[in-house]
């Protein structure tokens, strides 16, 4: 990045070059007009060979091209037509190839004879030296640091003309002298003209927070909140004060006749009536619990094949397979649309110097040239000794910031920052949503006695009081005399009671009498039971803002998070500043046909498609009966991790936290492994630009794109220039549901389905009496997933749940619309510097920052990879020759040049040093037979090469892609003869070559191991018919003979398709080197060999003269990691990693059979975990596991190794894996991984939406399970009513006929024994769990779970249910449970207690009375019997039953026991 910035500074300084001619011309619509010609903006032209101009936004900038004074290394340099400076002509190269087996190439021959001297040019008129110009005004720079600055190094690289040349004729140039010693440094140049404005600096660090602003204007009134829930009823108000006495009422009418007289004395009890007739049969009882499983029936006939199962979940991604063999070339795709014009390419590598061409014919005399440059200096003395190296210069000024990288993926949500300082109090907010009902408070202290309340409504008639004792009879009066018959008197008093008659039938209830006079005020009554919740009150006015909490202590620094996944490629940066045009390069070799590009990026979003047709309305689901509102349950445990919520509004600024402690120094890191092969050497000097290559053929067809949604054809838009990619916006709100999408493509074939459904159900048998609860049966195999049920009507919106913990980081959503900007928080105190994170993905482009002060001279970094080509710049002045560059990588083979003239024969070279043994090459295709050549002279024997050490055979690597063709290597030693391959197709018959010289016989090699058969190659093009020989039988391998005389190779046959690479054989021993043959003519470059090891560092050459600054290179490869810093403090915990892949689920163990219940002991300590059950069939795919530990450190430099970006390249892939790694993978792995993740998430969501009742996917209750899977049979399933962590799921019995969820008690029964002794004569109800020794209240569900978890499950089940039922079986011995046969009443019936402490009795309010299904405990018989109670209610909060209170117990011979039935919710 730094080097790029410095080069940008050079480019800016180049624009300040004093020789630039600025000609302001009239602008032609942003273009320019110059010398009568019109040019578009950014056009570059040469009005003369040694002048170049560019149109820059209406201004014409021209510059003289100054040729280099350096002598060219060629005998006859030429000035190409239209060019200014002389170049060496490029010779053609003959496409010859050295004969196979020939010795190494001889040394370079002597120079040829000098060419014919060219004609002398017209002498130029030497100019008089001009007077130096006056110094320019000092430059103005607003953002530069103050103080003296030295720009002379920048100016030194440019030739500054200081005057106009005039004067007399110059003599002929003398012969060139030897190079002089390096000249002294030049004088400083004139101050430059003001520079163009620099890049905008990056934003400064945030300043100190300003004072709090004034409160903003009040916000718009928000929409009305939803209606609050009904509040609880208030407590009864205190009685009002006593009112004033009312006015006297109007006199009432005359009263009615008085009541009958006092009631007479009660008669004696009558005799018992006759026994009534048998009552009508009772209502049919509820179905009993299911009986125990019957014996298995005979195997039925084969059922009809089941419906095809749904496709199974996709398997986890397999390990990466080996690269497949290279496919045959596909059909050429259709020609693509013309691409947009690319930026000018970077100059190609300098080509090799060709042989001198023949001198051209004399041209016509040219126009009189401009005054020539100053003549050569006279001959100088011999070169002096090179000076000592100068001290390194100071570090240059910091250049403008580089183009920022693309924005990375949105990271996972960071840990909460430290609390900010208190903000100014905000305006009062609108009314909040009504809160949830608070928990019931503790009872307050007892209030003072209230005033007398208003008298209540007359109560219902009480029960009859006990009979009074009969009074004594009064004495008889004397008989009176008979008087006259008077008028009928009033009704007399009642006579004495007659003989009691038989009890008559009960009369109808009489009408209520009028209210009696008001009684005296009674004493105030006790406080009544609190009333039920009243209607919800109106929401109260919002309270004032609470006071700020104290700042929390600073948290410890957590561990550093794992590096995030690599972000996507950023958008293309803006084009750089236009550079000077470079000199014309040599013709480059025509490029190979490029591979077809990958699919283009997505186009602009089309207009929305038409809405789909509205689907038919589904049939309404059955409406359940409305349940009464249950009591508020206790709060449930933490819910399942929710999907990530939308971003909340910005919170108030917290107070700044204190800075955390500084971390300790870390241990030094482990030494890194051996580095990969070094980067390519520095680029050679730029060659002349090549002629444009022929148009390449169309590449192979690209991968098939995904099916796009069919949008309506939009109108053709004008092609806009691509804008910069914006930063991702905040997440938008949830959009409205879109129209119905197109039908998806058919899914792949699913896994084999499970066995089909059971056969049709047989007729129902008669209902037997309910048996006791059976032992739990073995768990049956899971049935096949059923079809989704019909969607029911939309339920009413549920209450808002508590916020779940943050879910795992989802895939990045589409960028939402920009949200309103949040308030700016105050700046927190700076924390200690954390450990350097892995390099992040490049961020979006920032503005350029101001130049920093010069830093110290940095260590030279590794050479960067070439930068993207800039726009064409002005041509720079020709620089002095730089020091020789290191050899560049061999280029692709150039086109064959025309043959050059034969050079004179060179002297014989010395015998070359023996070459190191080459790697045995794979066996080549059969060459064409050459014609027999004339025998060559035998060369002298070469020195034997050293014997190489046999390396260890490595594991077979993946087949690498074919490399670029490299130069042909020198011949390797004779390899061990391999086994004959399968015969290849007949090649073209070549012309016979002349025989080669006889080589010395090699040492006999040891027999190699037989190689594996190679894959047969595909047929080559048909050759001319050879003389067919008869095919002989295959003989055994003979011992290797001496190598024969190699013939000259025929012309190369057509290249066959690449076969798969065979296993590499072990290196054979090196034979003695053959005598060097005569030097062959230079062959055409062979295919590129494998990359060589990095050579040893050569001796340091003498420092060359500083060349001109080169073009900006591509960004360098990432540097090697610096030394490990000190150990930092443990960072804060990173965000949760992505969920792991789905692990295979362990099968559930078989359930054991229950033993006989023993007597209830005190609760023991929790037992050890039982042994693992036997392996069952695999269950459904499990949820993703927790994140694994961090992986091993990735490859060096770049956060995510470049090898991963290159599609996980070959074995040797390193920092340059995108260039030297595997075949391109088109990044399909990323797509597959994303699709796998999506399918995995889809499967998990499917199991959440439609759980199957397994332990891994528990349902909420059995009713949900019945709706999702109507095919399931009644039995035991797992449910998780609180929908929290599924580790606390409980096993229940699901009645799939009704959808009831039944939870068994724990324990299931109370042992039958003598539980209670009471010697008092007066009996009463005694609660088993509260009062009896050894008694306990009944609990339910899994005993391994804590009691409070089970309570929460029950609370949720009650909320989810509208009905509940339970039965209890009371086993008795000499104890009455319900009806007392002796007295005929139920006074001795036992009581049951519900979970809300309500009591259920035999008679009274019908809502709290139980029913009796069977009553065998009606009298004392000395035998055991039983009574079965059942209680059903629409208030699920009343169940389950937690205690029982018998009445008729306490005697020494009275015993009882209880079977607690399951509680069932529906």
Curated annotation (Swiss-Prot):
Ranges for the region named Triple-helical region are: 168-1196
Which GO terms are recorded in the biological process aspect for this UniProt protein? aorta smooth muscle tissue morphogenesis; basement membrane organization; cell-matrix adhesion; cellular response to amino acid stimulus; cerebral cortex development; chondrocyte differentiation; collagen fibril organization; digestive tract development
- InterPro entries for the chain: Collagen, Collagen_superfamily, Fib_collagen_C, VWF_dom
Record note on what altering residue 1313 to R does: In EDSVASC; uncertain significance
In the record, which positions carry 5-hydroxylysine?
263, 284, 860, 977, 1106
Chain residue ranges for the region called Nonhelical region (N-terminal)? 149-167
Query: Which residue ranges are recorded for the region named Nonhelical region (C-terminal)?
Result: 1197-1205
- Specify the signal sequence span: 1-23
Which regions are flagged for Gly residues bias? 390-399, 426-435, 528-549, 642-651, 669-678, 693-711, 729-738, 836-850, 864-873
As stated in the Swiss-Prot or TrEMBL entry, residues carrying the post-translational modification 4-hydroxyproline are 173, 179, 182, 185, 191, 194, 197, 203, 206, 215, 218, 236, 239, 245, 248, 257, 260, 281, 290, 296, 305, 311, 314, 332, 335, 338, 344, 347, 359, 365, 371, 383, 386, 392, 404, 407, 416, 425, 434, 443, 455, 458, 470, 473, 479, 488, 500, 512, 524, 530, 533, 539, 542, 545, 551, 554, 563, 566, 575, 581, 590, 599, 602, 608, 620, 635, 644, 650, 656, 659, 661, 668, 671, 680, 686, 692, 701, 703, 713, 716, 722, 728, 737, 746, 749, 755, 770, 776, 785, 788, 797, 806, 812, 815, 821, 830, 839, 845, 854, 866, 869, 875, 881, 884, 890, 892, 899, 905, 914, 917, 929, 935, 941, 944, 962, 965, 971, 983, 995, 1001, 1010, 1016, 1022, 1028, 1040, 1043, 1046, 1049, 1052, 1076, 1085, 1112, 1115, 1118, 1121, 1133, 1148, 1157, 1163, 1178, 1181, 1184, 1187, 1190, 1193
Composition bias, Basic and acidic residues: 229-241, 266-277, 823-835
Modifications made to the protein after synthesis: Proline residues at the third position of the tripeptide repeating unit (G-X-Y) are hydroxylated in some or all of the chains.
Q: Which cysteines are joined by disulfide bonds?
A: 1262-1294, 1302-1464, 1372-1417
Query: What illness does the record link it to?
Result: Ehlers-Danlos syndrome, vascular type: A severe form of Ehlers-Danlos syndrome, a group of connective tissue disorders characterized by skin hyperextensibility, articular hypermobility, and tissue fragility. EDSVASC is an autosomal dominant disease characterized by joint and dermal manifestations as in other forms of the syndrome, and by proneness to spontaneous rupture of bowel and large arteries. The vascular complications may affect all anatomical areas. Polymicrogyria with or without vascular-type Ehlers-Danlos syndrome: An autosomal recessive disorder with a highly variable phenotype and onset in early childhood. Disease features include cobblestone-like malformation of the cortex, polymicrogyria, intellectual and motor developmental delay, small joint hypermobility, vascular fragility, aneurysms, thin translucent skin and easy bruising, congenital heart defects, and foot deformities. Early death due to vascular dissection may occur.
Record function comment: Collagen type III occurs in most soft connective tissues along with type I collagen. Involved in regulation of cortical development. Is the major ligand of ADGRG1 in the developing brain and binding to ADGRG1 inhibits neuronal migration and activates the RhoA pathway by coupling ADGRG1 to GNA13 and possibly GNA12.
Domain comment from the record reads as follows: The C-terminal propeptide, also known as COLFI domain, have crucial roles in tissue growth and repair by controlling both the intracellular assembly of procollagen molecules and the extracellular assembly of collagen fibrils. It binds a calcium ion which is essential for its function.
Q: What is this protein called?
A: Collagen alpha-1(III) chain
In which organism is this protein found?
Homo sapiens
Supply the source organism's classification: Eukaryota, Metazoa, Chordata, Craniata, Vertebrata
């Amino acid at each position: 990045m730094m080097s790029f910035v410095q080069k940008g500074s050079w480019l800016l300084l180049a624009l300040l070059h004093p020789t630039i001619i600025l000609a302001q011309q009239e602008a032609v619509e942003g273009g320019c007009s110059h010398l009568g010609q019109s040019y578009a903006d950014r056009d570059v032209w040469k009005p003369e060979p040694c002048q170049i101009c560019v149109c820059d936004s209406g201004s014409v900038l021209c510059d003289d091209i100054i040729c280099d004074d350096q002598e060219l290394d060629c005998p006859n340099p030429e000035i190409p037509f239209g060019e200014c400076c002389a170049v060496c002509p490029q010779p053609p190269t003959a496409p010859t190839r050295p004969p196979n087996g020939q010795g190494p190439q001889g040394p370079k021959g002597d120079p040829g004879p000098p060419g014919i001297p060219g004609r002398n040019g017209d002498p130029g008129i030497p100019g008089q030296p001009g007077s130096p110009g006056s110094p320019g005004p000092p430059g103005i720079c607003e953002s530069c640091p103050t103080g003296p600055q030295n720009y002379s190094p920048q100016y030194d690289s440019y030739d500054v003309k200081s005057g106009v040349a005039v004067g007399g004729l110059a003599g002929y140039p003398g012969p060139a002298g030897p190079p002089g010693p390096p000249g002294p440094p030049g004088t400083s140049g004139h101050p430059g003209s003001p520079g163009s404005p620099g890049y905008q600096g990056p934003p400064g660090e945030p300043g100190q927070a300003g004072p709090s602003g004034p409160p903003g204007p009040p916000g718009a009134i928000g929409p009305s909140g939803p209606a609050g829930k009904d509040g609880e009823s208030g407590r009864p108000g205190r009685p009002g004060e006593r009112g004033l006495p009312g006015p006297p009422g109007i006199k009432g009418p005359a009263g009615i006749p008085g009541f009958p007289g006092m009631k007479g004395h009660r008669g004696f009890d009558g005799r018992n009536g006759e026994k009534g007739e048998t009552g009508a049969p009772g209502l049919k009882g509820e179905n009993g619990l299911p009986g125990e499983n019957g014996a298995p029936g005979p195997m039925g006939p084969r059922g009809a094949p089941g419906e095809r199962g749904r496709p199974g979940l996709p398997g986890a991604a397999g390990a990466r397979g080996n690269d497949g063999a290279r496919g045959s070339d596909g059909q050429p795709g259709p020609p693509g649309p013309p691409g947009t014009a690319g930026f000018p390419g970077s100059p190609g590598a300098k080509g090799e110097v060709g042989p001198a061409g023949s001198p051209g014919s004399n041209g016509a005399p040219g126009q009189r040239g401009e005054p020539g440059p100053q003549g050569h200096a006279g001959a100088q003395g011999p070169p002096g000794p090179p000076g000592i190296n100068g001290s390194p210069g100071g570090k240059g000024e910091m250049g403008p910031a580089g183009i920022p990288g693309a924005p990375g993926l949105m990271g996972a949500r960071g840990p909460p920052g430290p609390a900010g300082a208190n903000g100014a109090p905000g305006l009062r907010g609108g009314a909040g949503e009504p809160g949830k009902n608070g928990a019931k408070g503790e009872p307050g202290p007892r209030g003072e006695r209230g005033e007398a309340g208003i008298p209540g409504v007359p109560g219902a008639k009480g029960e009859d009081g006990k009979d009074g004792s009969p009074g004594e009879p009064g004495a008889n009066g004397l008989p009176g005399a008979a008087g006259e018959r008077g008028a009928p008197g009033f009704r007399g008093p009642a006579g004495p009671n007659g003989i009691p008659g038989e009890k008559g039938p009960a009369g109808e209830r009489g009408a209520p009498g009028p209210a009696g006079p008001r009684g005296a005020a009674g004493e105030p009554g006790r406080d009544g039971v609190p009333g039920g919740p009243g209607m919800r009150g109106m929401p109260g006015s919002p309270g004032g803002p609470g006071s700020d909490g104290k700042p929390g202590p600073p948290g410890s620094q957590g561990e550093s998070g794992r590096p995030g996944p690599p972000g996507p490629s950023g958008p293309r940066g803006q084009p750089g500043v236009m550079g000077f045009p470079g000199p014309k390069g040599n013709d480059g070799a025509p490029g190979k046909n490029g591979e077809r590009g990958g699919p283009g990026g997505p186009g602009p979003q089309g207009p929305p498609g038409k809405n789909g047709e509205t689907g038919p309305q589904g049939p309404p689901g059955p409406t359940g009966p409305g349940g009464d509102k249950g009591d508020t349950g206790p709060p449930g445990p933490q819910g399942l991790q929710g999907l990530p919520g939308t971003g909340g509004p910005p919170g108030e600024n917290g107070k700044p936290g204190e800075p955390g402690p500084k971390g300790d120094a870390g241990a030094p890191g482990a030494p890194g492994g051996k580095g990969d092969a070094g980067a390519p050497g520095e680029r050679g000097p730029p060659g002349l630009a090549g002629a444009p290559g022929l148009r390449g053929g169309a590449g192979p067809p690209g991968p098939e794109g995904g099916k796009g949604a069919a949008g309506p054809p939009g109108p053709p838009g004008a092609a806009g220039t691509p804008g910069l990619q914006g930063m991702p916006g905040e997440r938008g709100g949830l959009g409205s549901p879109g129209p119905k999408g197109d039908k998806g493509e058919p899914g792949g074939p699913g896994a084999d389905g499970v066995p089909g459904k059971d056969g049709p159900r047989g007729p129902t048998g008669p209902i037997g009496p309910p048996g006791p609860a059976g032992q739990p049966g073995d768990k049956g195999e899971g049935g096949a997933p059923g079809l989704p049920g019909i969607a029911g009507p939309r339920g009413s919106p549920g209450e808002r749940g508590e916020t779940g913990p943050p879910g795992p980081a989802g895939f990045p959503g589409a960028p939402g619309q920009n949200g309103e900007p949040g308030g700016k928080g105050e700046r927190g105190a700076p924390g200690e510097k954390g450990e350097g994170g892995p390099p992040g993905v490049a961020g979006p482009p920032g503005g350029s920052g101001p130049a920093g002060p010069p830093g110290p001279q940095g260590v030279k970094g590794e050479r960067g990879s070439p930068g993207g080509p800039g726009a064409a710049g002005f041509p720079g002045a020709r620089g002095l020759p730089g020091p020789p560059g290191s050899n560049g990588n061999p280029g692709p083979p150039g086109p064959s040049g025309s043959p050059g003239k034969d050079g004179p024969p060179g002297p014989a070279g010395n015998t070359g040093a023996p070459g190191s043994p080459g790697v045995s090459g794979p066996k080549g295709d059969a060459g064409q037979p050459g014609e027999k050549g004339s025998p060559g002279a035998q060369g002298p024997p070469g020195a034997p090469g050293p014997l190489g050490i046999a390396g260890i055979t490595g594991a077979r690597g993946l087949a690498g892609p074919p490399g670029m063709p490299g130069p042909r290597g020198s011949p390797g030693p004779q390899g061990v003869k391999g086994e004959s391959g399968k015969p290849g197709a007949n090649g073209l018959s070549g012309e016979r070559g002349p025989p080669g010289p006889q080589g010395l016989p090699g040492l006999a090699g040891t027999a190699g191991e037989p190689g594996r058969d190679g894959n047969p190659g595909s047929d080559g093009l048909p050759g001319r018919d050879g003389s067919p020989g008869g095919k002989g039988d295959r003989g055994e391998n003979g011992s290797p003979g001496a190598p024969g005389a190699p013939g000259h190779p025929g012309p190369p046959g057509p290249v066959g398709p690449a076969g798969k690479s065979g296993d590499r054989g072990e290196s054979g021993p090196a034979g003695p080197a053959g005598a060097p043959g005569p030097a062959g003519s230079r062959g055409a470059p062979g295919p590129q060999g494998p990359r060589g090891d990095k050579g040893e560092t050569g001796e340091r050459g003498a420092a060359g003269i500083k060349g001109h600054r080169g073009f900006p290179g591509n960004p360098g490869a990432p540097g090697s990691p610096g030394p490990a810093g000190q150990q930092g403090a443990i960072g804060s915990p990173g965000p949760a990693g992505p969920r792991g892949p789905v692990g295979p689920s362990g099968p559930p163990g078989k359930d054991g059979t229950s033993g006989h219940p023993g007597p209830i002991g005190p609760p023991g300590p929790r037992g050890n975990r039982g042994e693992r059950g036997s392996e069952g069939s695999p269950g459904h795919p499990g949820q993703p596991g927790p994140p694994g530990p961090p992986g091993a450190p990735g490859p060096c430099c770049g956060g995510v190794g470049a090898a991963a970006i290159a599609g996980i390249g070959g074995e040797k892939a390193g920092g340059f894996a995108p260039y030297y790694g595997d075949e391109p993978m088109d990044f399909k792995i990323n797509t597959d991984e994303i699709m796998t993740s999506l399918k995995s998430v889809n499967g998990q969501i499917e199991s959440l939406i439609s759980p199957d009742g397994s332990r891994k996917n528990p349902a909420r209750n059995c009713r949900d399970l019945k709706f999702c899977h109507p095919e399931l049979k009644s039995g035991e399933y797992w449910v998780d009513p609180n929908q929290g962590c599924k580790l606390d799921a409980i096993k229940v019995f699901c009645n799939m006929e009704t959808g009831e969820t039944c939870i068994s008690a724990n324990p299931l029964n109370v042992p039958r024994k003598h539980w209670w002794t009471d010697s008092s004569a007066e009996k009463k109800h005694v609660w088993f769990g509260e009062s009896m020794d050894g008694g306990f209240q009944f609990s339910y569900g899994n005993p391994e779970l804590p009691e409070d978890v089970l309570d929460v499950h029950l609370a949720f089940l009650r909320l989810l249910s509208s009905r509940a039922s339970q039965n209890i079986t009371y086993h008795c011995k000499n104890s009455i449970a319900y009806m007392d046969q002796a007295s005929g009443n139920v006074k001795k019936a036992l009581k049951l207690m519900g979970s809300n402490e309500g009591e259920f009795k035999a008679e009274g309010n019908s809502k709290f009375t139980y029913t009796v299904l069977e009553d065998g405990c009606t009298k004392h018989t000395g035998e055991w019997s039983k009574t079965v109670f059942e209680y059903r209610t629409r208030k699920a909060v009343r169940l389950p039953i937690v205690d029982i209170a018998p009445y008729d117990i306490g005697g020494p011979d009275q015993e009882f026991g209880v079977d607690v039935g399951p509680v069932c919710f529906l």
